[in-house]
């Protein structure tokens, strides 16, 4: 019996508590420390549902490839000679060695360095080494039997590539739901769309992956954890009034209005109005955006900072800098984060400002990330003592469905918060996680029953 078989539905059901009448919104800290839950998450969330893989701009040319992970499984994405994108498990169909061992490159064919089998970048086995007299059976390499294993579901939305190793998942657009409209507001900043800029930062923190997924939409911690950044920015503002490359200030973040939106399938967003939107790289484009998309959407594109979580592994952040933040769980208490700066294509005159804003706050050597990582470590250490995490802040003014601001931009969240410090979005996200864990336990139980019956 596998370790996950010792997980009962009653245990899963007890991990997240929500009682509106009693004002209880909390979760047990075991959900961040139990290795049995981590095994289920890897199999049924990171390998068994849609997750973010890459952006199309990272595989721009024919024969380009890009490697990444889906849970515990290595993946690579290729653009073949016809310009079509494909995603495969990064393992030779012969004996399982990885084919692509660099982050990215350009190859029309991929030859395994173990036994020399060669595959096209469309996944077809082209040749095996020394086939003459090898004595392969007649069934060898028939009907694609030894081609590379494709990622079961692979799709793009506005240049963002997603995959699932399980076939029976909802269509991607249905999975993304209302969060697609937020993606649209970021992509539509340029007629040519977005591109990922060269360079990245990767780091590992000592904590569960869900801590980062929470924190990316946690407006409550900003003034406490990032007070030093806010103070530094205020000094810069006074000292460098004529600076062309101005970092966005955190000193009044959320003070000009903000809130959150919870969407279906664990997606969520925290937002806040900028006190100084004129420092945004896109500010000069406001008239064009208003003409194309209307005043309300143009206001959101420029005047509002937003952190959008595309559950479970991507944050699309458009605030102190513009970035993709990708979460990769390594173990129940270790998580790898990779961040990339993104920008509208063709933004050359304002590119420097965008990159400097990104580096200032978010880079691994920036003024915010190290502070966050220390809090993640401290949380994971504290979780060992058990107990409950409270998520009730703002409960008296959460709004079922869209608030007035969401209606102005035709956004229909499941829950709205009127302040960026409110915690209702964590309740919604962890309830979705709980539902996925219940489904996972049932699938594992059904699999065991089927195996015992054979």
UniProtKB/Swiss-Prot annotation:
One of its GO terms (molecular function) is iron ion binding. Pathway: Xenobiotic degradation; toluene degradation. Residues 51-148 form the Rieske domain. It is an enzyme of class 1 (oxidoreductase). Transmembrane segments: none annotated. Binds 1 [2Fe-2S] cluster. Binds 1 Fe cation. Its cofactor is [2Fe-2S] cluster; Fe cation. SUPFAM superfamilies: Bet v1-like, ISP domain. Fe cation binds at residues 221, 226. It holds the Pfam family Ring_hydroxyl_A. Disulfide bonds: none annotated. Its EC number is 1.14.12.-. [2Fe-2S] cluster binds at residues 92, 94, 112, 115. Keywords: 2Fe-2S, Aromatic hydrocarbons catabolism, Dioxygenase, Iron, Iron-sulfur, Metal-binding, NAD, Oxidoreductase, Plasmid. GO terms for biological process: toluene catabolic process. Belongs to the bacterial ring-hydroxylating dioxygenase alpha subunit family. This dioxygenase system consists of three proteins: the two subunits of the hydroxylase component (XylX and XylY), and an electron transfer component (XylZ). This is Toluate 1,2-dioxygenase subunit alpha. It comes from Pseudomonas putida (Arthrobacter siderocapsulatus). The lineage of its organism: Bacteria, Pseudomonadati, Pseudomonadota, Gammaproteobacteria, Pseudomonadales.
């Amino acid at each position: 019996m596998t370790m996950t078989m010792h997980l009962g539905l009653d245990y899963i059901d007890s991990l997240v508590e929500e009682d509106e009448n009693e004002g209880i919104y909390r979760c047990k800290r075991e959900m961040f420390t139990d290795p049995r839950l981590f095994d289920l998450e890897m199999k049924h969330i990171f390998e068994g549902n849609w997750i973010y893989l890459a952006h199309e701009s990272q595989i721009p040319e024919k024969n380009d490839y890009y490697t990444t992970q889906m849970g515990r499984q290595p993946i690579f994405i290729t653009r073949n000679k016809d310009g079509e994108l494909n995603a495969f498990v990064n393992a030779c169909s012969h004996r399982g060695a990885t084919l692509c061992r660099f982050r990215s490159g350009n190859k029309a064919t991929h030859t395994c360095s173990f036994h020399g089998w060669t595959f096209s970048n469309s996944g077809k086995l082209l040749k095996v080494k020394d086939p003459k007299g090898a004595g392969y059976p007649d069934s060898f390499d028939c009907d694609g039997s030894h081609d590379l294993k494709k990622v079961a579901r692979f799709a793009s939305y506005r240049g963002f590539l997603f995959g699932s190793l399980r076939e029976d998942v909802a269509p991607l657009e249905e999975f993304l739901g209302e969060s697609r409209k937020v993606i649209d507001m970021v992509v539509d900043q340029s007629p040519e769309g977005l591109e990922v800029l060269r360079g990245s930062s990767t780091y590992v923190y000592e904590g569960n992956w869900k801590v980062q997924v929470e924190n990316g939409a946690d407006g409550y911690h900003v003034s406490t954890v990032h007070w030093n950044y806010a103070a530094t920015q205020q000094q810069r503002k006074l000292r460098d009034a004529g600076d062309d490359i101005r970092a966005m200030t955190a000193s009044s973040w959320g003070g000009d209005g903000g809130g959150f939106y919870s969407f279906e399938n664990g997606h969520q967003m925290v937002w806040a109005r900028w006190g100084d939107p004129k420092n945004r790289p896109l500010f000069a484009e406001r008239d064009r955006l208003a003409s194309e998309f209307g005043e309300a959407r143009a206001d959101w594109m420029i005047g509002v900072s937003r952190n959008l979580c595309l559950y479970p592994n991507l944050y699309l952040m458009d605030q102190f800098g513009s970035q993709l933040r990708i979460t990769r769980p390594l173990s129940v208490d270790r998580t790898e984060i990779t961040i990339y700066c993104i920008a509208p294509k063709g933004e050359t005159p304002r590119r420097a400002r965008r990159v400097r804003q990104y580096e200032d706050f978010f880079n691994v050597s920036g003024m915010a990330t190290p502070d966050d990582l220390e809090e993640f470590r401290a949380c994971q250490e504290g979780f060992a003592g058990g107990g409950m995490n409270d998520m009730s802040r703002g409960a008296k003014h959460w709004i079922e469905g869209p608030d007035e601001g969401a209606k102005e931009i035709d956004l229909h969240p499941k829950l709205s918060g009127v302040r960026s410090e409110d915690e209702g979005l964590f309740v919604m996200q962890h309830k979705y996680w709980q539902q996925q864990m219940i489904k996972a336990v049932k699938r594992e139980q059904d699999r065991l029953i089927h195996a015992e019956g054979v």
